[in-house]
Amino acid sequence: MVTMYFFTLSFGTVASGIMVISALNPVHSVFWLVVAFISSAALFILLGVDFIALMFIIIYVGAIAILFLFVIMMLNLTDFTPAFRRGGEADMTNYVPIGLAVGTLFFEAIASSWLIMGGPYVYRGLLGAWDLANPWFLKKYHNIEAIGRILYTDCYYLFILVSFILLVAMLGAIVLTQEIGTEIGPTAKKQDIFVQTSRAQV
């Protein structure tokens, strides 16, 4: 029964992810993104990691997806040409190498995960991985404490890398708001709510 639930939720997550990038309406894309987040949270609950599942629902569904929805509602999408509708001219072949590179990276990660988790024991010993069939770190500690121990001991470099990525994203947002030629002005350091919410050109 658990296996059936796992495959059902996995299929739902993958299908929702496909619908996110294939839906023509941006609001529908956000809806399918919320479905993908909820399916992923259900998978974590099924695995017994309830803390990450709750964080998925609170942060991704309650904050990020709603933020995407507000951004889509504030954008004037009628200014963009409907590239994927009938008669639209869109050449997406330039993105094929990027898609292949990202797909290869994901498949390599999946293969590495199989060697660590489900592969022969000799590979697990060579890679220095845990025997996840007997998750001692989830049995000895609460899952929040186990995640903290793993995050700040063995995966500390990933934590530092994420902090640098967030710093770059923050600096990029500041640079984008100082874009020259915008309606607010090239050197504006304040918000003009009327200009931001107005659909007409000022």
UniProtKB/Swiss-Prot annotation:
Topology with respect to the bilayer: Multi-pass membrane protein
Compartments, as annotated in UniProt: Mitochondrion membrane
One GO MF term attached to the UniProt entry: NADH dehydrogenase (ubiquinone) activity
Transmembrane helix is among the record's keywords: yes
Stretches that traverse the bilayer: 1-21, 29-49, 52-72, 96-116, 156-176
Pfam families given in the database record: Oxidored_q3 (PF00499)
Primary location class: mitochondrion
Lineage: superkingdom: Eukaryota
EC category: translocase
Family: Belongs to the complex I subunit 6 family.
Protein name: NADH-ubiquinone oxidoreductase chain 6
Species for this entry: Metridium senile (Brown sea anemone)
